[in-house]
Structures are given as C-alpha cells and as structure tokens.
Amino acid sequence: MKGRPFYQNVKRESGRKVQTGNINAAKTIADVIRTCLGPRAMMKMLLDPTGGIVMTNDGNAILREIQVQHPAAKSMIEISRTQDEEVGDGTTSVIILAGEMLAVAEQFLEQQMHPTVIISAYRRALEDMLDTLKEISTPVDTSDRSMMLKIVHSAINTKALSRWSELACNIALDAVRTVELEESGRKEIDIKKYAKVEKVPGGIIEDSCVLRGVMINKDVTHPRMRRMIKNPRIVLLDCSLEYKKGESQTDIEISKEEDFARILQMEEEYIQQICEDIIRLKPDLLFTEKGISGTCHLQCLKQNNTNITAIRRVRKTDNNRIARACGARIVSRTDELREEDVGVGAGLFEVKKIGDEYFTFITECKDPKACTILLRGASKEILAEVERNLQDAMQVCRNVLLDPFLLPGGGAVEMAVSKHLTERSRALTGVEQWPYRAVAQALEVIPRTLIQNCGASTIRVLTSLRAKHTQDNSVCWGVDGESGCLSDMAALGIWEPLAVKAQTYKTAVETAILLLRIDDIVSGHKKKDKEEQMGGQGAE
C-alpha cells in the first residue's frame, strides 16, 4: 500500500514505449486515408452508429465517423477537423504528412536522440518551409474567371464530383462571388452563414444551380395568400404575431362575465395594433421567426384590401440570408417598423412544389449578398457527397480571393521545398541537421502517395522527379495524378492556394511536435465499489 501512489486500476505508461505507441497510432490513422489522395482516390464506405451509410473520399468526413481509443489517434483526427474549419481543403494531405513526420522521427528516438533536439530541428524546418512557399508562390488575378475556374477544378478533380467538374466549378465560383462583401478595405466572405446548400432528392445533378437569392422549405400560412409576387416589398420580423401569453405564474381573477369579454377584446385590440403597424408600410411579404395567430391572418387578408403573404417560423439563419439578399432589416417589435426597414431588392417571390414539399423562392435580387445552392441528385448519399465536395470547392475560392497567391499542385511544391531544405541542411552543424533533413524526406510522401494511387512505379517516377527538380526552373514539375507520369503543373493548370498549403505544413509539423513531447500517458480512474455505495446509503 505504501509504495503505490495511484489507484489500482490507473494505468501508467512512460518513456520510449509511449513515444513508439504515439507514432504507431499516428501512422495507422495516416494509412487509413492514404488511398484517398489525388484524382485516382479510392472511396470509403462507413456505417455510422444509427445504421446510415457514408460514402466519401474526404479525409475529414472519414475520420469523423471512425471511433478510436488511442489519445494520439484522437489528436490526429482533431487536426483534420481543424484543417477543414480553417481552410476547407487539404484534410487528407495534413494527416498523411503528420504521420510521415512522426515516422521519420522514430529512427532518431531509437538512436537515443532527445525529443527536444528533434522538436527544435522541426521548428526551424517549418520556418524555412513557410519562407520557401512564399518565394515560389505566384500572384493570381482574381478577376480572371478562367484562371479561378482552373484553381477550383484542381480542388474538385480529386472528388466524386469530378464528372461534373465544369458545373461544380461555376456553381462554387458564382456562390463565393455573390457572398463576397468589401467593407472599409477589408474583404469578408462568410460561406457558412450566407451560402446555404439545399439538397432536394430527385432530378439529375445537371439540374443543380445557384439562385440569386434565397430558397427556404416553407409554404404560405393561408390558402388565400398570393403565391407569386413580382418586386415584393418584404418585412422581416423577429417577434410573435400572437397575443402575448402570460408567464407560468400569471393569475387573472374574473368575477363577472364582462371581465372575460374585456380580456378577449384586449387580446383582439393588441393583435389589431400589431397588424396596423405592419399594414402601415404596405408590404407584400412578411417573414417572422415566431408564430402568427388566426386573427392576424384575417387582418392581413381583409383590411383595406391588403393581401399580405405571411410565412411563419422561419429559421434565424434563413431570416439573416433573406435580409442580406433583399436589403431588409430584421425588426424585433412591430411598433419600431420604419420605411427603411422594408426590403425592395428582390425581383420575384414564388412558392413551388418540388417532389412532395413546397419551397419558397425569393430570387432575381438586384445585389444579393447571400445565395442558395440548389442541389438535385438521385439519392441522399450522393447529395451528401456532392455537398461535401462543393463546400471544399467554395473554400478554395474563398482562400484565393482572400490571399491571391498560388502554388503548383501534384506534389511539385513538396519536391521544391524538400530540395530547398536539403540544401539548407548542409549549412547546419551538430546533431540537429539530421532531423532537419528528415523533414525534407518526409515531404516526399505526398508525390509518392500520388504515384502509388495511380498504380505507377513509385521508385522510377520519384527518382525521375528528384532528378528533374535539380534542374533550373523546374519548380512546377510534379506528378500527374491521372496517369502517374511527370508533368508541368502550370501547363496542366493544376494549382493550389498558398493559404491551404501553408496551413497544411503548420498543422502537420505542430502535431508531430506535440506528439513527440508526450512521454507519459496516465489512463483510468477510480471506480466506486458497490459496498462503498451501499455503506454510504446506510450511513445516511
């Protein structure tokens, strides 16, 4: 008892065993999605706990569905999610690269090299990698549509959507251009909030399009309301158009019949006042995030021959998008409504039936800063994969518009950076030069994986690529992901945004450093014995 500081079921691992375990866990995760890189990527079919099927080759989507036990493996899955949230692309590359960074560190740990020395070399290598990326990057004219389409095509080409790449590229670029907002010299592109993807099963993928406006899965609240309005005046509310219900502790004492009639009259007067506030502005269309009472419906339809079309219980996010699309302002109280709060930017409002459901369209907006991407397809699984691919494509567009610098794809950048690091390692002295040089070796995993996924000869093609990069002006030479041959990426038009590549390198190296610093894992916790619990109950 004296010699045991931990509880009996607490397990502690330390030293070399932990570091080897972490490296093996990271390598295993990297091996799972290694075949998902490049245009010849294989797809994975995953069964989720509810029995649903996920078919994808998106690194983040695969790892999100996998249940892991090892803490290092959990860290690897987390970096894929971070990459997806930060830049939206490169989720597979970052895992493969992080796994390789740890794999090359294993030999130095076996040679009794201290992890701090390896980490110091990795940090220095990361700084040099980022400097090299800036040196070899080329600026891009974001107003050149054909160039932008080429960049998006490079991102989509590795996905299931590659068959419809032209359509997908145009959809992604149009959507991002629509939500682009420039205020006081600063660009803001919020895809998550203002570019909504609506998946409607049925039809074919070629029917998909970008709507210059908003589409929501709602119908009008009364059959007599208009279902098509040209140039509508739109009012957006964030308040209920029903009589205000009392709180849970509200009591009303009624002593005679007239009191009850008076209460009902007060309710009606309150709703009458709300309706008058709205009707005063002569809107055609009313959206509210809360409910609408029956009395209010009748007022909207009857008074002064008005026929206001009302749609209730609209989501907050949808209301925000409608506001951006038509220029309206969301108001929290009807008595605060002013003429400038009315949106007049929309050209057409209509309700359409697609399949079994009704959808409301607000389109032909003059200057929409929000849009809806309508996706059609054979099944829910296909639509889910198409949406994932489109999100990646839109993120690539966003990255290029915010940071207009490009790098050649197809492993060309990795080979160029690897060559620079190898040259710089010769100037280093001491033990640090070996881990520094190992980073250069690790970078070659990207072109090597591309070659493997094509089924080409890895040794022959990689040796030729190394030889090619020793020549001048060979930065753009990489692996053609379709055939596995050497090609000039600039000629093929395969480009990657600088923001994605820089984030991939930062995340991969930082993760390798994080896992190398771990030398102790303490797992388990004290479980209460049943006797203790029973004793505790008895004592009470």
Question: What name fits each language-model region?
Answer:
Residues 1-61, 65-67, 122-385, 469-472, ...:
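Extended amphipathic alpha-helical scaffolds
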Residues 48-82, 89, 102-104:
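A helix-coil-helix interface module used to build multimeric assemblies
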Residues 13-16, 60-66, 80-90, 116, ...:
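A short glycine/serine-rich beta->alpha loop
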Residues 85, 89-92, 107, 111-125, ...:
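Hydrophobic, well-structured modules enriched for small/aliphatic residues and gly/pro motifs
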Residues 20, 67-69, 370-540:
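Extended, low-charge hydrophobic alpha-helical regions
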Residues 38, 88, 112, 172, ...:
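Residue-level signature of catalytic and energy-coupling elements of molecular machines
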Residues 91, 95-96, 116-123, 433-441, ...:
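Alpha-helical transmembrane segments of multi-pass membrane proteins, especially transporters
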Residues 45-48, 94-98, 322, 415-420, ...:
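Short hydrophobic alpha-helical segments that form membrane-spanning helices or hydrophobic packing faces
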